[in-house]
Amino acid sequence: MELKATTLGKRLAQHPYDRAVILNAGIKVSGDRHEYLIPFNQLLAIHCKRGLVWGELEFVLPDEKVVRLHGTEWGETQRFYHHLDAHWQRWSGEMSEIASGVLRQQLDLIATRTGENKWLTREQTSGVQQQIRQAMSALPLPVNRLEEFDNCREAWRKCQAWLKDIESARLQHNQAYTEAMLTEYADFFRQVESSPLNPAQARAVVNGEHSLLVLAGAGSGKTSVLVARAGWLLARGEASPEQILLLAFGRKAAEEMDERIRERLHTEDITARTFHALALHIIQQGSKKVPIVSKLENDTAARHELFIAEWRKQCSEKKAQAKGWRQWLTEEMQWSVPEGNFWDDEKLQRRLASRLDRWVSLMRMHGGAQAEMIASAPEEIRDLFSKRIKLMAPLLKAWKGALKAENAVDFSGLIHQAIVILEKGRFISPWKHILVDEFQDISPQRAALLAALRKQNSQTTLFAVGDDWQVIYRFSGAQMSLTTAFHENFGEGDRCDLDTTYRFNSRIGEVANRFIQQNPGQLKKPLNSLTNGDEKAVTLLDESQLDALLDKLSGYAKPEERILILARYHHMRPASLEKAATRWPKLQIDFMTIHASKGQQADYVIIVGLQEGSDGFPAAARESIMEEALLPPVEDFPDAEERRLMYVALTRARHRVWALFNKENPSPFVEILKNLDVPVARKP
């Protein structure tokens, strides 16, 4: 059927369209120069209007677009409209049946996902959301019309409501699921560890997100959560033992985790590995070779000897090298360098050896060619860094030569090789669940290894337990942003906070928490204590009072109670400890650097060396251009890592902490602690 404008109507209307033709499932409007096809699946409404003389048809399309036909005889316009409308409505009724079926399928999908007795992940809800939106975009009717049809209206509204409140629906489902699991598995959560898990620990264990960061403050029971998580996966049948990968950062920590797993879960089929042991396993399986880790990796003296020998050789044989090294050590490091053959000076050799060791290690950790290292350095230091790299290149070459002679690899090389094998698909990961301890210590290289494992199976979950307040190993490559920006680096997921510490009292917690959270770059989290502490639980004391303090402790400390003396550097070990065995024979006293004390605890902690200066705490920034270019960027907040080191020291104690300071040259931390209402005692 066709409708045309009258001759006069056409002339007066001056409109691009003057006729319309009804098609099988649409309408075509056209004029002398223009033609427009309107499929019914884009048509929202048809309006028939009468002007002063002629009729007018109006076709409403999406995005507020309207197509009009003017100048038609009114009677013919009415007849055409009624015929077109009946045809369109008939077509719409048929299409509504199809749309209704599609909508019901979407409701079934929602019901299936939300009805499952399992955690609903963000990834799953995003997938459902995407699937529903794709289904809506493929409907034969415009979604704006679905409210018109009785068979579509309710289903459409339910789909829209779910899409609108998708996050609250997910949270509601997971809350109900968690409560059900905590009730159903109450015995498991009571018995899986030596003490029952608290609600925050149990909720972290139950959380089924693909990428989960568990922030575990000092003494909050992170190991219990890792063990319980492994046990939970087994109890729920979500994984077999060989599908669970448990990672620790040191061999001792891995061995302790193994023992805990055997003791609590009664299985030897789950083995905790270090990242290096994992890399070794991947290389063995993926290349059928058994790489040998160089003896040099565990022999500091031999490494130092190797680097100093090569350094002396370069300086003695090449004037340019000698000149470059003299300039580096005097201008940048501000060291006193002897005249003449400075490379033969034994004191300088001893001082430089550990630096050369660290710098070669950083270059190996980077793993790229010299040009890549230089290109990745900040622009403002790139030229100078390029000169330093050229001076270091022979030492790196000597290191590689030593490895080749030994037919061995180093730790950095292990991880690089493992990543290459994974990326080439020569090793297929069997692990569905990766659990990582001390996640805050992760470096970009180790993060790349995790990413390569998860890339092979997008459903592999990452359960990362750590504490950004205790990131103290930047010199080993630890990058705090991998924890603080966890989901940007490891995909969308969740965060759980373990909110109770079983170690220290409320006063130690209050001081330590306020001290660390003055840095806005640290994640905010609660950490509550089970015991109260008085004002003196943290006390500032003059360093001259150490003997008097130990005298006093000898009067009331029980034989089984441990006293831990902590310092920023090993050479700050107090001379008083030389006589400890005879003067305080009943006291159980240990000395450690704060770095070494990580993971330790004691009844009483004495922090020594709170002074300013070259051996001060906080330590003065003494990075060379090598660290600046090859390590993660230094944070903007002053003494950020040193502040975290102080937090670690404070939180080793159960009952009391004494911070001993130099009255003549006190550490800046002393004033900060005073401002946190920490009292200064004249005597213990």
Give residue spans per PLM region.
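Conserved helicase C-terminal RecA-like lobe
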Residues: 433, 558-560, 587-588, 598-663, ...
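Anionic N-terminal interaction surfaces
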Residues: 1-19
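Helicase P-loop NTPase motor core
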Residues: 213, 220-226, 492-494, 500-587, ...
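P-loop NTPase Walker
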Residues: 23, 33, 37, 44-52, ...
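Conserved helicase NTPase motor core
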Residues: 127, 136, 140-153, 160-218, ...
